[in-house]
Amino acid sequence: FMCDEMERSVHDALCVVKRVLESKSVVPGGGAVEAALSIYLENYATSMGSREQLAIAEFARSLLVIPKTLAVNRAQDSTDLVAKLRAFHNEAQVNPDRKNLKWIGLDLVNGKARDNKQAGVFEPTMVKTKSLKFATEAAITILRIDDLIKLYPESNDKGQSYQDAVRSGSLEN
């Protein structure tokens, strides 16, 4: 079992290296991209004067699911960590002197935000771009469904619904 797991880990690492070489660029990991994009889109949404503002703001909010999930999976306080992450990325976008904060991502081992460029925590740009694109396309597909899917109660062999069969006691042995 241990050898299989090691083989998968080495394979995964080689795939990451392959993606980095293909895309020739990396982005900081640990939710940094999602936090930065969320802040940017929230600011952009406030400049809109139409109903599109609501959709953009909600999409921006949805991007924070990634850093929140990272924190929750590591049993960390996701609210506090994501708030700090957002504060760093907001500062990086509004203050030109603090542009270096754009590299801040989550350090889940120590439960804090850190400079992931210095820590060497990166993701291939191609992987990040594709994952955001596919997730967005999946959400759009779901939103385009305009049919009501109705499930009818199951019926047993006597023509009764499951709830009726439970009430009548016909399911008991």
Swiss-Prot record:
UniProt xrefs under PANTHER family: CHAPERONIN
Record organism: Ambystoma mexicanum
Function: Component of the chaperonin-containing T-complex (TRiC), a molecular chaperone complex that assists the folding of proteins upon ATP hydrolysis.
Keyword Transmembrane on entry: no
Assembly notes: Component of the chaperonin-containing T-complex (TRiC), a heterooligomeric complex of about 850 to 900 kDa that forms two stacked rings, 12 to 16 nm in diameter.
Pfam family name, one: Cpn60_TCP1
Domain of life of the organism encoding this protein: Eukaryota
InterPro entries linked: Chaperone_TCP-1, Cpn60/GroEL/TCP-1, GROEL-like_equatorial_sf, TCP-1-like_intermed_sf
Gene3D superfamilies linked: GroEL-like equatorial domain (1.10.560.10), TCP-1-like chaperonin intermediate domain (3.30.260.10)
Major location category of this protein: cytoplasm
GO terms under cellular component: cytosol
One annotated GO molecular function: ATP-dependent protein folding chaperone
Entry's family note: Belongs to the TCP-1 chaperonin family.
Keywords: ATP-binding, Chaperone, Cytoplasm, Nucleotide-binding
Protein's cellular compartments: Cytoplasm, Cytosol
Protein name, entry field: T-complex protein 1 subunit alpha
Keyword ATP-binding set for record: yes
